[in-house]
Regions:
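Catalytic-core regions of glycoside hydrolase
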Residues: 1-151, 157, 176-185, 191, ...
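Noncatalytic modules at the cell exterior or secretory-pathway interfaces
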Residues: 410-422, 468-477
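Extracellular beta-strand elements of beta-rich domains used
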Residues: 435-437, 442
Length: 495
C-alpha cells in the first residue's frame, strides 16, 4: 500500500483510522510504502510517519523518499538528509517491521548527484560525511576534485542542496503574468556555486562527464538570471519605461537561446530525443501524430487543472516553447492588446512541427564562460519593487476592469491571512471582486464581496481551511477595476 496519504492528509489519517484500515490484515500479507519521508521532514514539517503511527501496526514497511515530482530538472534537496535520514528510522523504537529502503521519483534524468547519494546511502547504516562523499563522487565522475569544484558544492549545499522545494521551477516555466517568483532557492550562494562550477572547467575540460554537467549547470545559472530579467522587465512596464523593458526583453531572449543552445550538446536534456521516443513507438502515421502530440503535451501544459507540471529544462523546449510563450506575452504588453496564451499553447502542442536541433560543433567551455560574462551583472539589487511575500504585479487603464491570476506558493497557505494590493502608479480608486483561491483544482476560498482601496492600498481578508496542502498547485484569481485614472501596483500575501 502506498502511504502518501498518511503524511499528506493527517486531518483524516490518525493512528486509530490507520488501525481501522490495516489492523485485520495479517502482517505478512501487507507491505506499506512510507512514500515521502522528505516531504514529512522538509515540506509538511510533520512528525515522521513511523513515529506518528507507532510502527505502522507492525506491518512490513519501506522507508522511501520522493526527490522529484513530474521529472522537473530544477535542483533541490537537502543532501545531508538524503544521506543520513534513514538512520533515524533504523534507530527508532518505533521502527517496527522496517524491511527496505527506497526512492520513488516521478521522473529521473535530473539531479544526478542526489540520486547517486540516495542509492549509495541505502547500503549504509553509518553516518555519511556529505562533503567527503561529494569529493569521492567528483573523483569517480570527473577524475578529479579541484578546489573550485568543491567550493561549488559548498555553495550549492547552502542553497538548492541545503533546502527542499516542492516542485522546483523557474518563473519562466510557468504561464507569463501568473507568477512573480519561481520556487528554486536562488539565493546568492546559488549563483556563487554555479560560477565556481563553471570556473572549474579550466581543470576539468577533458572530462566528458564534467562537460555534460557543465552544460546543465550553465543552464541553471542562466535560468536564474532569466528569472530575474522577467522581474526587471515587469518592473519597467509598471514604471512606464517601455524602451528599457524592450532592451531587457532582448537580453532575456539571448539568455533563453543560450540555455537552449548549450543543452543541445547534452545527451538527455533535449526535446528532440523525447519526441523521437514517442514517434518510434508508433505503427501508423495517425499513431505517430497522436503520440507526438501527447509527448508535447505532457512536458508542457500537462493539465488542466495541473499546468506546466513537468517543467523540463531542455533544449528545444526552452527556445521554442518557453521563449515563444513569453514573446507572445510581451507582444501583448507592448501593444496593450489581450493575448490568448492558452490558445498559443494549444497550437504549439497540436500544430507545431519545428526542428529543435542546433549545430553542436562549438566549444562548450568557451560558450559557458561567454554566457556567464553576458549575464553576471543581472542581480536582485536592480529590483526596486520588491515586497515581502510579493506574488505579482497588476496594471489597469482608466475605468477598465480585468481578471488577474497569480500562482501562490503552497508553503504560504498555512499562515496566509489575506492579500494586499499596493498602488505604485496613479491615484485612482481600485475595486477588487470575485476573489477565489483554488488549491489542487478545488476552490477553498471564495468571496463575492467588492472591496475598495483606501490610501493607495486594498486589503482582502482570507481564511484558508485547515488541511489544505496544494501539492499540485495553488492559484489566486480576482477581478480588479480602476474607478478613475491609470493605476498599477503589486500584490503580496499577508502572513
Amino acid at each position: 500500500m502506498q502511504g502518501w496519504m498518511f503524511g499528506y492528509q493527517r486531518h483524516i489519517w490518525d493512528y486509530e483510522t490507520l488501525g481501522a484500515l490495516v489492523s485485520r490484515v495479517p502482517n505478512e500479507k501487507m507491505l506499506l510504502l512510507d512514500l515521502a519521508v522528505d516531504y514529512n521532514k522538509h515540506f509538511w514539517h510533520s512528525e515522521v510517519n513511523w513515529e506518528y503511527y507507532k510502527g505502522f501496526y507492525n506491518k512490513q514497511w519501506v522507508y522511501s523518499v520522493i526527490p522529484n515530482m513530474g521529472g522537473k530538472v530544477g535542483m533541490t534537496g537537502v543532501l545531508d538528509f538524503y544521506a543520513n535520514g534513514h538512520l533515524e528510522a533504523l534507530a527508532s523504537a518505533n521502527r517496527g517491521n522496517l524491511v527496505a529502503h527506497g526512492l520513488a521519483p516521478e521522473g529521473i534524468e535530473n539531479n544526478e548527484v542526489l540520486y547517486e547519494l540516495v542509492t549509495d546511502a541505502g547500503w549504509s547504516n553509518r553516518h555519511i560525511d556529505v562533503r567527503e562523499w561529494l569529493r569521492q563522487y567528483s573523483m569517480n565522475r570527473y577524475g578529479a576534485a579541484p578546489e573550485q569544484l568543491m567550493t561549488a558544492w559548498d555553495y550549492l549545499m547552502k542553497s538548492v542542496y541545503g533546502s527542499f522545494t516542492d516542485h522546483p521551477r523557474f518563473n519562466w516555466q510557468l504561464r507569463p503574468g501568473s507568477v512573480k517568483n519561481g520556487s528554486i532557492n536562488m539565493n546568492a550562494d546559488y549563483f556563487r556555486g554555479l560560477e565556481s562550477f563553471i570556473a572549474a572547467s579550466d581543470k576539468l575540460k577533458d572530462s566528458p562527464y564534467f562537460l555534460t554537467d557543465l552544460c546543465e549547470m550553465t543552464a541553471h545559472y542562466l535560468g536564474g538570471k532569466a528569472e530575474l530579467l522577467t522581474k526587471l522587465i515587469d518592473q519597467e512596464y509598471l514604471l512606464g519605461d517601455t524602451l528599457k523593458a524592450r532592451f531587457l526583453q532582448s537580453r532575456f531572449e539571448t539568455l533563453m537561446l543560450g540555455m537552449d543552445r548549450i543543452l543541445s550538446w547534452h545527451p538527455t536534456l533535449r526535446l528532440d530525443r523525447w519526441l523521437s521516443f514517442a514517434k518510434k513507438s508508433a505503427r501508423t502515421d495517425a499513431q505517430r501524430k497522436q503520440y507526438e502530440i501527447n509527448a508535447r503535451r505532457i512536458v508542457t501544459v500537462w493539465g488542466p487543472p495541473v499546468d506546466d507540471y513537468a517543467a523540463r529544462i531542455w533544449s528545444g523546449l526552452i527556445g521554442n516553447y518557453y521563449l515563444g510563450r513569453w514573446k507572445e506575452y510581451y507582444r501583448g504588453r507592448e501593444s496593450g492588446e489581450p493575448v490568448n496564451l492558452a490558445e498559443w499553447e494549444r497550437r504549439w502542442v497540436e500544430e507545431n512541427h519545428d526542428s529543435y536541433r542546433w549545430n553542436t560543433d562549438f566549444d562548450i567551455v568557451s560558450f559557458a564562460k561567454e554566457m556567464l560574462a553576458l549575464s553576471k551583472d543581472i542581480s536582485t539589487a536592480q529590483l526596486l519593487l520588491n515586497r515581502p511575500n510579493m506574488v505579482g504585479t497588476w496594471s489597469l487603464g482608466s475605468g477598465k476592469a480585468k481578471e488577474f491570476e497569480y500562482h501562490i506558493p503552497a508553503r504560504m497557505l498555512t499562515n496566509m491571512k489575506g492579500i494586499t494590493l499596493e498602488g505604485l502608479k496613479g491615484n485612482g480608486m481600485l475595486e477588487c471582486s470575485g476573489l477565489m483561491l483554488v488549491a489542487d483544482g478545488i476552490a477553498v476560498v471564495s468571496s463575492s464581496e467588492v472591496i475598495s482601496s483606501k490610501n493607495g492600498k486594498l486589503y482582502c481578508k482570507m481564511i484558508v481551511p485547515n488541511g489544505v496542502n496544494a501539492n499540485n498547485g495553488c492559484v489566486l484569481t480576482l477581478k480588479l477595476k480602476s474607478k478613475d485614472g491609470n493605476v498599477a501596483g503589486v500584490i503580496a500575501c499577508d502572513m
